[in-house]
A protein has these predicted regions:
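Catalytic histidine-centered segment of alpha/beta-hydrolase-like enzymes
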Residues: 245-258
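Active-site loop/oxyanion-hole signature of alpha/beta-hydrolase fold enzymes
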Residues: 3, 9, 42-90, 120, ...
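Conserved HGGG/HGGXW glycine-rich cap/lid loop of the alpha/beta-hydrolase fold
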Residues: 7-55
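Short glycine-enriched nucleophile-adjacent loop
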Residues: 92-102, 107
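Flexible "cap/lid" loop of the alpha/beta hydrolase fold
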Residues: 104-140
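Conserved loop-alpha-helix segment in the C-terminal half of the alpha/beta-hydrolase fold
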Residues: 203-245
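Conserved alpha/beta-hydrolase "nucleophile elbow" surrounding the catalytic nucleophile
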Residues: 19-21, 83, 87-89, 214
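Conserved alpha/beta-hydrolase catalytic His-Asp/Glu region
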Residues: 143-203
């Protein structure tokens, strides 16, 4: 598996973007560019260990902790002690793990995974959804891009990702298939997740937190899966709902995702921005 260079753009406040399970940094391309174009953020979006283009995991099994270990090393190489961390799905789980280690200035979970305890039925429901997708995953490994020629392939590929089949472009769909076909983390992480709890220390989150819910999320539907975050995060955590989008909203609504991130980061950084640009007397 070839390792690719992470997305690294812009200058200003450090922002780390973490992608979902089975996918790669490519899901953040549009949002990363939009954040960098504000002129206020230095954006870093790596592909996590065991995923297409990421470093080898170095272990038989994967967990959010192991993934966070790899990301921490990358932050150290950048010279970033802390960053504003934004994660989607699995990336959201890893974002909270990094916050627990003191690496976050703020944390945003977009349709974040990990909102369960060890024996929560919702945990096994999510794992079951990924296991149910195993035949499609095996087809992508056998056929590669030819998978997209099969009947209903677009519908099946986009069902867990977007609010509608048209929410993902042909180029994005091709990248999704490539990512899924080259992701050893699939088995490594699912097996380990069966044995581990999710995010149990949300109440101790010590930085500003932002929960982004996706109305048409079919992987972690917000009506049932958001409660763990809204109940256990400290009072004052911001909650944003993106209407009409699925589990990976960066595909169908990158501008709205960027807007939600920037609005929250502006709230987090206002004092320092006022210090840099004091009002005219």
């Amino acid at each position: 598996m070839t390792t690719r260079a992470p997305i690294h753009l812009g200058s200003g406040e450090p922002v780390l973007l973490l992608h979902p399970f089975l996918m790669s940094q490519t899901v953040w391309e549009a949002v990363a560019q939009q954040l960098a174009d504000t002129g206020r953020y230095e954006v870093f979006a790596p592909t996590m260990a065991g995923h297409n283009g990421g470093p080898p995991a170095g272990t038989w099994l994967l967990s959010s902790s192991v993934l966070a270990d790899h990301v921490e090393r990358q932050l150290d190489e950048l010279g970033w002690d802390t960053a504003h961390i934004v994660g989607n799905s699995l990336g959201g789980w890893v974002a909270y793990e990094l916050e627990r280690r003191g690496r976050a200035r703020s944390v945003t979970g977009v349709a974040a995974a990990g909102g369960w305890t060890r024996w929560s039925p919702v945990k096994f429901e999510v794992i079951g959804k990924f296991i149910a997708g195993m035949p499609i995953l095996l087809l992508t490994r056998l056929l590669g891009q030819r998978t997209l020629r099969l009947p209903l392939s677009r519908r099946l590929a986009t069902l867990p990702l977007s609010g509608s089949p048209d929410g993902v472009s042909e180029r994005q769909l091709s990248a999704i298939v490539d990512d899924a076909a080259h992701c050893p983390a699939y088995f490594q992480l699912l097996i380990k997740s069966l044995l581990l709890p999710g995010l149990l220390e949300l109440a101790h989150t010590a930085v500003p937190a932002h929960v982004v819910l996706c109305e048409k999320d079919r992987v972690v539907p917000p009506r049932r899966f958001s409660r763990h975050f809204t109940e256990f995060l400290p009072e004052g955590a911001k909650v944003t709902t993106l209407d009409g989008v699925g589990h990976v909203p960066m595909f169908e609504a990158p501008g709205r995702v960027t807007e939600a991130i920037v609005e929250f980061l502006d709230q987090c950084t206002q004092p320092s921005r006022r210090a840099v640009n004091p009002p005219a007397s």
